């Protein structure tokens, strides 16, 4: 099949969140199976691609305004990457906005990108069997395709919702600026409480909808659909496919970032040495018997930082050390720094996104915190298990699908989870994990090590998930044929 991804992120060129990982990994796996895959991306200022080839220049009419743009091409892992270069929209320091908030003209930036992507795949790429769009940033591809690109009628559109909380909602008066007729401003289409909802438009106009875990596919059709549950329930084809991780890249046996490599047979010594190294790196001089809990994520309310902030002082008292790594909202950056000040010597933080440091931390941590309020899929808990850091998670979305709660009756557990999103439930679960962890220092007691072995043995590669996507693509093509 010929498949064209249209996305706002793709590792390693541009990554803000998990979307970049998914697009890169899925495209790579599809190519390995013999499919012809291309990816269309904005050519952000931050992209430092090598071997970039200029292809052509185009002019686009968007709402009566003409925009010139250039199309460039590169290739990564046998995937053709087409970069749309338009300096007004993408020649900025950040991808979506500054730390103070999103860019005010994001509606125009991503409407332009969606329309320019269709022009690109019409004139530069081979016309694909499938256009696979991702989140609200490219949801208008489905709308514009139905409106203006009749020669693509036989091409099916698949929309993956990675995070339904972000929908691209803007004031209704923008419609003329983005070249969409007022006839689509109705409750059956883009209108959403008298505003324009890009993601809703993508849902209505796409042939198949996917999201990133089976549990989350059910959740978004309930009151966890952020207002779009009714639209989703009306769609016949809504599927949940669990994301995978690139197990070649995320491999503690070969990861060059680690102080010492290890695998499922050598993790006892390997993780101990990495823990000593990472504690020294972050300036923690506490006894080595204290468990080290790591938080590696975007600093945002969704990620459960309110729960952690309430529980951290008590958790330190019962014997935990903490390391935070991530960037995000100024408010939560402040919260993290407050936790460090209150528990100096037991809690450390780096306010940055740093891939190499994150790898060191996965390897050195005993536990990995992901008490997310909601989590469509989550990649962090999969990487953590791969590196033998035991996840402590809220039982929601993809966390419910990937982490098996450990208890005395379930020897196959891979982590610890809690049902109610309260700090008391979270702290109780941390205490449960602590009790089992302390047994590692009892001779002949292998309970903790068994959990680590279970976690490291999990297969979170893309091999299984990519087969499900291929089935979805075939379903979408069949819908188009009928």
UniProtKB/Swiss-Prot annotation:
Keyword Cell membrane among UniProt keywords: no
InterPro entries named among the record's database cross-references: Glyco_trans_1, GS/SS, Starch_synth_cat_dom
CDD domains per UniProt: GT5_Glycogen_synthase_DULL1-like
Enzyme Commission code: 2.4.1.21
Binding site for ADP-alpha-D-glucose: 15
Entry GO MF terms: alpha-1,4-glucan glucosyltransferase (ADP-glucose donor) activity; alpha-1,4-glucan glucosyltransferase (UDP-glucose donor) activity
Example GO biological process: glycogen biosynthetic process
Annotated metabolic or biological route of this protein: Glycan biosynthesis; glycogen biosynthesis
Keywords: Glycogen biosynthesis, Glycosyltransferase, Transferase
Catalysed transformations (reactions): [(1->4)-alpha-D-glucosyl](n) + ADP-alpha-D-glucose = [(1->4)-alpha-D-glucosyl](n+1) + ADP + H(+)
Family (UniProt): Belongs to the glycosyltransferase 1 family. Bacterial/plant glycogen synthase subfamily.
Chain's role: Synthesizes alpha-1,4-glucan chains using ADP-glucose.
Listed HAMAP family: Glycogen_synth
Name this protein carries in UniProt: Glycogen synthase
Gene name of the record: glgA
